[in-house]
Amino acid sequence: MITRRGVLAGGISAAASAAYGQAPLSSLVPMPRPTAPTPAGAAGLENLIAASPYQGAVAAVVADARTGEILQGHNASANLPPASTMKVLTTLYALDALGAGYRFATRVLATGNLRNGRLEGDLWLYGEGDPHLDTTGLAMLVTGLRDIGLREVTGALHLVDTSLPSIPLIDATQADYAGYNPAISGLNLNFNRVYLAWEQGTNGLQVGLDARADDLRPAVLGIGLTVADRAAPILDYRAETATAREGWSVARSALTGEGGRWLPVRNTAAYVGEVFASLARSSGIVLSRVQRATAVPSEAVVLSEISSTPLDGMLRSMLRYSTNLTAEVVGLRATQTLTGAANPSLRQSADHMAARLDGRYVSGRAELHDHSGLQDLSQMTPVQMVQALVAAGPRGRLRNLLRAHRVNDEVQAQIGTAEIVTKTGTLNFVSTLTGYIEGPNRPLAFAIFNADLPRRAALGPEERDRPPGGRTWIGRARTLQNDMLVSWLRGFG
């Protein structure tokens, strides 16, 4: 049951685009009053949309953030992809399940006997899925081993990544080289990306892969890399089924001057193991073998351990930088905690999140396929998004995690001193915006979904990086969104 007053009710009629008074979201059937005049200063949404060069679907709603009273809407019950505004729902889901202080641990454990710096036994690297673990974090674990005097391991380093299901990617429709479409595992490193760097040296082109973080640059040799004399494709990914070894081929024509880019890693355990072993060797610790394992023996003893930042800080970073890996990891961990399921798929986990939110934060079960919003199969209504914002409250923990809305000087002059905090979402021909407006009179909660799904579906694989007309379309969508914010602030805030 949702207890926050004014929350929940069905949507607004798709045709209701003029401003009107309406019963709060908590009523079973919204009762629009189309004859209510548009408040002074607020423009009718139909007029704003008609005056805009933007082309595509628009679904938008604004409500009183304290009572849930819907103040204005347009196609507000239309189901469209929320894109990365989905992370607002994931934030609420994870905080409810795990708590703001939850931390992910990464441990190095040992079985056997440690004598005079020599471990006659095995090491076990166990991860709880920390999405922020980077090479610096691994180096801290190695330092912990060195500080207790470890110098040699006679057995193997076992990699245990089974605390989360191993998922090779979030969205199968994305390009192989999309760094925002990473693998998910119980052992994640550098957001499951490896850095491709190149420069023109005295002996010609120098190219390589590394796991850089801060001032560390451990080379990564376990992922194949070749340079090919071709014009296209610039990047080509291959994975060997038998060995799970992955590799990249790069077009020489693209490697001009000095540069670099992050590439996704699919076999995350092998990547983590190689980097950890490299750091250990650099610290004088001899490791002979690295292999995967499914569990840590019960008799293993912790030798070194690090913990992630608390969940609320992790979520603040996720909402600011829209990190998909963080969203999927915290969503999966929340589902594991609530259901006891050890290996839910992304679809199963997202579906459980939708069921959990229904009746607590939203009215009706949204169609969710992930926790990040990367898949356009995930769809919901802007009314549902606003319901979640109202339920969370304009002074609640979600409000404090969202970032200030960034606008140009012209829009800022119209907003004045009002505070607007938002989460944005962007896919090809999808642009979404949701958040709170803190005006002089009352706080508002809003959601705006813009999409041209037929145009998105028509893109060929070679067009997805730079879709024809995509930049212009996004610019027009964002201008329309800002026009709505200014209108709502003037009329209702």
Please state what every model-predicted region is.
Residues M1-P24:
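N-terminal export signals
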Residues Q336-N450, R455-F492:
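Small-residue-rich helix-loop
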Residues A63-A65, Y126-G129, V160-T162, S253, ...:
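Active-site-proximal beta-strand/loop segments in catalytic clefts of secreted hydrolases
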Residues Y93-G99, L332, Q387-G393:
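Short glycine/serine- and small hydrophobic-enriched flexible loop segments
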Residues A50-H74, R292:
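A short, well-structured edge-of-sheet supersecondary motif
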Residues Q22-I49, A97-S363, A458-E463, R476-G493:
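Conserved serine DD-peptidase/penicillin-binding transpeptidase domain
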Residues G56, G73-Y93, A97:
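Short active-site loop at a secondary-structure junction
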